[in-house]
C-alpha cells in the first residue's frame, strides 16, 4: 500500500525578506508574469547575476528568474514565453559542471519551492517527488524503509531530482546502479507550448497512432519519435558507444534497447527480465536532455535497497598507467566502485593538514591508488570479496579473510599492483573515501589565473582501452606544455581530467580549444564518449557531431524540433550552436579591479583579486548543515536564498569588481543585500571545497565601506559591544529593564535597524570572570590535575551567558582538569 509523505522547504515568516535589488529589467515582462503565477518573479539586476553562473566555467546573464510554486506556474510561464518567443531554462541546484544551467533565458528555479516528496510506495519500491527536491532529502525520507534513490552524484546532497533527470546523473557506484534513466518510471512534464502531460511507458503502435491522430504538439512528438525509431534504430544501435556511462546527445539508444526488449540491467549483468519488445518509456528520453525538450516538474522513480554493508580494498601502484592496466581485471570481481587517484593529487594531499594523515597510510613510492568497494550482505561476505580480489591482483599481500579456492587465478591478467590495504569498519572506509574525494578540493583551491577547469573532464572510455588512452592524453598535455590530474571513476572508464589553462589570455583559450579537439579525436578512436556523467551543456555540445556523425546529428535536431519547434528551451545545448570557448567566466576581455588598496595580507592568495575569483560555484554551501561540512552556511540554511549562500556572495562580489554589476561593492545597496547578513562565522573558510573565506573578504570590504561612508550608530554599537556589555553588567538589572519599556522595540528598530521582534541580550550583574575569581579560581590544583585547560570566555559568555562558562568549568573539573582563565579578558 502506498504511504504518503510530504517534505517542503517553503519559507516561513522568519525568513520573509526582500532579497532583490531595486533595479528591475523589462518591467512589462515582469508585470505580465506576475499576473500569471503564484510564485516569485525576479528580474532585478542582483538576481539575474546570481543565476548567471553555475558550477561550470561559464557565465551568461539570464533574462530573469521565476520561482514557481507548482506545475501550473511552470506551464503559465512556458506558454507565455512560447507566445512571446522568449527562451526558457529550467534549473535545479545549479551544480552543473558543463554550463547546462547558464543561458540567456527566463530561468525557472524549481529548487526554490517545488520540493515535495509526494508519495513513497514501499511495497512497489517507488517514490514520486517534485523536480526540486534535493536527492539528499529524498533519500533521508527513504532511509527508514531501507530504500534509496540509487544514482549518487558527488553533490547529491545539493543537486535535485529534476537536475538528475536532465543530466542523466550517476556517481561513483554506477558499476552497480547505472544512470538515472534506468530508474525513471513516469514523469509529469510541461511541453514547450505550456501543455502539461505525463510521459511513461507506451507501446510502439500507440505511439504511431497518437502521432497520426492528433495535430497538437504532443501528437507531433509521438509521431516523430516513432518515425525516428522506425527509420534510425539500426544506425543508433551501431553508432552509440557501447558503454555503461554515456550521456552525450539524446537518450535514443535507451529507447532502441527497450523497443527490442534488450534493456540491460543497471549493473550490466544481463537483460532486464521486465524488458518486453514493442514498447518504450518516453520519460526516459528526457534523461540527459538538459531541459531542451521539455521541463520535468514531477517524476516517479524506482528505488533500490540500501546495501547491508560494504568493504573496501585500496590497491597501490608505481604509476597511473599500471593502475589503468589493472582496471579491466578488477571488474571481473564485480565491484560496486573502482576509483583512481594519481601522483599529482597524492603529492598535493600530502602537503595539506586535512589529508596528510590519510595519505600517510600509503606505502612509500605510491604514485597511484585504486579504491575498490564491494557491497555485501554481511561483513564476512565483504571480507571474502576483498580477499579474493587481493589474491588475484596482489597475491603476496595479506588479507583478513582466506581467499576462495581458485581466486588467485580468476583473471590470469598481468599483475601491476604493488600493495593492498583493506577496510571494513565504517570509520576506516570513510578515511579511504576521504582521500579519494580530496582531489577536487585541492585542485580547485588554486588562486592563480591558471585554473583546472572542467571542459574535457568527463570522457568515458572502455576499461580495456584506458591505459593507451591515458598515455595518449598525457602526450597531448605535454604538447601543450600543461598538466592535469587523473582521478575519479576508473571502473566505468570516466576519468575527471582537468588540464591547467589560463582562459584570461587569447593563447590560453586557443590551448583550451586545441586540447579539446585533440582529446575528442582520441575519444572517438578508442570507442568512448565525450561525456560519461556531467553532460553536454556549453562545454561539449559542439563535439556531438564528431562523436555521432552528421546523420545522427541531424536526427537529434529533428527530435529537438518536434519537441520545441521554435528552439526556445535551453537553446544551444545538446544539438545547438554552443561552443566550448564561448561565454567563459574568465576570458581575454575579463578584467577585475578591486577599486581600493586592501588592508589585510593576501600575499599567499595571489592577492585579494585571487580570493575574489576563487569560488568555482560547486554549490557545496547550499544544503542542510549535515551536508555542508558542519557550519557553512548558516544564512543560506535560514533563508534558502542563493544571495545568502557563500557562492552567491562570492559571485556577486566578483561581478561587482569585474563590471558585470553596475554597483561597486561599497555601495549601500550592495552592502545591505549581499554582505550585511553574513555573520562572519568563517564556516566557509573551513568547509568550502575551495576554501572561500567570505568572512575575511567581508571584513576587508566593510573596513573600506566605513572609510568611505563613515559608521552609523548601529555599526558603532556592534563594533564596541564588549564595552557596552561591561556597562550593561554593571548596571544590571536596570539595563535589562530598558527593553521592557513601551515602545522600546519600535525605537531599537528605527535607531539601530534591529527588528522590533528581536529581544536584546540580557546582562548579568556577576560576570563569568568575576564568578571564577570569587570561587577562588580552579578547584582542581595544577599538581593534582591530569591535564590543564586555558578557557577563553568571549563577550557573550562573560556578560550575557555566564552559565555556559560555569558549565564548561564544572565539566572540565569533573574530568580532573586544571582550568585557568587568562588575565584581562
Q: Whereabouts are the PLM-identified features?
A:
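Noncatalytic alpha-helical scaffold of FAD-dependent oxidoreductases
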Residues: 1-91, 95-486, 495-532, 542-627, ...
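Generic hydrophobic alpha-helical scaffold/packing signal
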Residues: 253, 327, 390, 470, ...
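Iron-sulfur-cluster electron-transfer modules
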Residues: 325, 361, 446-450, 663-825
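Active-site-adjacent "gating/activation" loops or surface patches in catalytic cores
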Residues: 482, 647-650, 783-784
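Hydrophobic, well-ordered secondary-structure elements that form the walls
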Residues: 534, 564, 633, 678, ...
Amino acid at each position: 500500500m502506498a504511504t504518503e509523505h510530504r517534505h517542503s522547504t517553503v519559507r516561513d515568516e522568519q525568513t520573509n525578506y526582500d532579497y532583490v535589488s531595486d533595479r528591475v529589467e523589462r518591467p512589462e515582462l515582469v508585470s505580465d508574469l506576475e499576473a500569471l503565477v503564484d510564485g516569485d518573479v525576479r528580474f532585478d539586476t542582483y538576481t539575474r547575476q546570481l543565476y548567471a553562473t553555475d558550477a561550470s566555467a561559464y557565465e551568461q546573464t539570464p533574462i530573469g528568474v521565476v520561482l514557481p510554486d507548482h506545475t501550473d506556474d511552470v506551464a503559465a510561464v512556458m506558454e507565455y514565453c512560447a507566445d512571446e518567443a522568449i527562451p526558457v531554462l529550467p534549473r535545479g541546484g545549479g551544480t552543473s559542471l558543463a554550463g547546462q544551467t547558464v543561458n540567456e533565458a527566463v530561468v525557472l528555479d524549481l529548487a526554490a519551492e517545488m520540493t515535495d516528496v509526494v508519495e513513497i510506495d514501499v511495497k512497489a519500491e517507488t517514490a514520486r517527488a517534485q523536480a526540486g527536491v534535493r536527492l539528499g532529502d529524498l533519500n533521508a525520507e527513504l532511509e527508514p524503509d531501507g530504500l534509496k534513490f540509487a544514482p549518487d552524484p558527488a553533490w547529491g546532497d545539493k543537486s535535485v531530482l529534476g537536475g538528475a533527470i536532465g543530466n542523466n546523473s550517476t556517481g561513483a557506484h554506477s558499476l552497480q546502479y547505472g544512470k538515472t534513466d534506468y530508474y525513471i518510471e513516469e514523469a509529469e512534464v510541461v511541453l514547450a507550448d505550456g501543455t502539461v502531460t505525463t510521459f511513461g511507458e507506451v507501446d510502439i503502435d500507440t505511439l504511431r497512432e497518437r502521432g497520426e491522430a492528433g495535430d497538437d504538439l504532443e501528437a507531433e512528438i509521438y509521431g516523430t519519435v516513432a518515425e525516428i525509431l522506425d527509420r534510425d534504430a539500426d544506425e543508433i544501435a551501431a553508432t552509440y558507444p557501447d558503454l555503461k556511462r554515456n550521456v552525450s546527445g539524446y537518450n535514443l539508444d535507451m529507447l532502441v534497447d527497450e523497443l527490442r526488449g534488450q534493456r540491460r540491467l543497471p549493473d550490466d549483468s544481463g537483460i532486464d527480465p521486465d524488458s518486453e519488445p514493442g514498447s518504450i518509456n518516453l520519460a526516459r528520453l528526457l534523461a540527459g536532455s538538459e531541459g531542451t525538450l521539455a521541463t520535468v516538474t514531477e517524476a516517479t522513480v524506482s528505488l533500490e535497497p540500501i546495501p547491508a554493508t560494504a568493504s573496501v580494498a585500496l590497491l597501490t601502484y608505481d604509476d597511473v598507467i599500471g593502475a589503468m592496466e589493472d582496471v579491466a581485471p578488477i571488474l571481473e570481481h564485480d565491484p560496486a566502485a573502482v576509483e583512481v587517484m594519481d601522483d599529482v593529487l597524492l603529492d598535493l594531499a600530502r602537503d595539506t593538514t586535512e589529508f596528510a594523515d590519510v595519505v600517510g597510510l600509503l606505502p612509500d613510492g605510491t604514485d597511484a591508488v585504486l579504491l575498490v568497494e564491494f557491497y555485501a550482505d554481511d561483513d564476512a561476505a565483504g571480507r571474502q570479496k576483498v580477499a579474493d580480489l587481493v589474491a588475484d591482483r596482489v597475491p603476496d599481500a595479506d588479507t583478513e579473510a582466506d581467499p576462495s579456492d581458485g581466486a588467485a587465478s580468476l583473471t590470469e591478467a598481468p599483475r601491476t599492483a604493488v600493495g593492498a590495504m583493506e577496510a571494513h569498519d565504517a570509520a576506516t572506509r570513510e578515511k579511504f573515501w576521504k582521500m579519494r574525494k580530496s582531489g577536487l578540493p585541492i585542485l580547485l583551491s588554486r588562486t592563480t589565473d591558471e585554473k583546472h577547469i572542467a571542459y574535457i573532464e568527463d570522457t568515458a572510455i572502455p576499461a580495456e582501452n584506458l591505459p593507451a588512452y591515458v598515455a595518449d592524453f598525457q602526450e597531448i598535455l605535454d604538447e601543450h606544455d600543461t598538466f592535469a590530474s587523473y582521478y575519479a571513476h576508473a571502473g566505468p572508464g570516466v576519468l575527471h581530467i582537468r588540464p591547467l589553462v589560463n582562459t584570461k589570455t587569447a593563447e590560453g583559450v586557443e590551448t583550451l580549444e586545441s586540447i579539446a579537439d585533440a582529446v575528442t579525436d582520441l575519444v572517438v578512436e578508442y570507442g568512448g564518449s565525450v561525456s560519461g556523467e556531467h553532460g553536454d551543456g556549453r562545454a561539449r555540445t559542439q563535439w556531438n557531431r564528431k562523436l555521432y556523425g552528421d546523420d545522427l546529428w541531424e536526427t537529434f535536431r529533428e527530435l529537438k524540433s518536434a519537441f520545441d519547434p521554435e528552439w526556445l528551451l535551453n537553446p544551444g545545448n545538446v544539438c545547438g550552436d554552443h561552443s566550448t570557448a564561448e561565454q567563459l567566466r574568465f576570458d581575454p576581455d575579463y578584467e577585475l579591479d578591486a577599486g581600493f588598496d586592501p588592508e589585510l595580507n593576501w600575499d599567499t592568495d595571489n592577492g585579494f583579486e585571487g580570493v575574489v575569483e576563487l569560488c568555482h560555484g560547486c554549490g557545496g554551501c547550499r544544503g542542510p548543515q549535515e551536508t555542508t561540512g558542519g557550519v557553512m552556511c548558516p544564512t543560506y540554511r535560514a533563508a534558502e536564498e542563493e544571495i545568502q549562500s557563500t557562492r552567491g556572495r562570492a559571485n556577486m562580489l566578483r561581478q561587482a569588481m569585474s563590471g558585470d554589476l553596475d554597483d561597486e561593492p561599497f555601495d549601500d545597496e550592495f552592502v545591505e543585500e549581499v554582505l550585511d547578513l553574513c555573520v562572519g562565522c568563517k564556516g566557509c573558510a573551513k568547509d568550502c571545497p575551495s576554501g572561500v573565506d567570505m568572512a575575511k573578504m567581508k571584513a576587508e570590504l566593510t573596513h573600506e565601506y566605513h572609510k568611505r561612508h563613515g559608521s552609523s550608530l548601529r555599526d558603532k554599537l556592534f563594533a564596541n559591544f564588549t564595552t557596552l556589555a561591561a556597562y550593561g553588567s554593571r548596571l544590571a538589572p536596570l539595563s535589562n529593564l530598558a527593553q521592557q519599556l513601551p515602545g522600546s522595540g519600535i525605537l531599537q528598530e528605527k535607531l539601530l535597524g534591529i527588528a522590533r521582534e528581536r529581544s536584546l541580550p540580557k546582562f548579568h550583574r556577576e560576570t563569568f570572570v568575576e564568578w571564577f575569581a570569587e570561587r577562588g579560581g580552579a578547584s582542581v590544583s595544577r599538581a593534582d590535575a591530569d591535564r590543564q585547560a586555558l578557557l577563553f570566555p568571549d563577550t557573550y559568555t562573560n556578560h550575557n551567558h555566564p552559565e555556559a562558562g560555569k558549565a564548561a568549568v564544572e565539566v572540565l573539573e569533573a574530568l580532573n582538569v586544571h582550568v585557568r582563565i587568562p588575565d584581562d579578558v
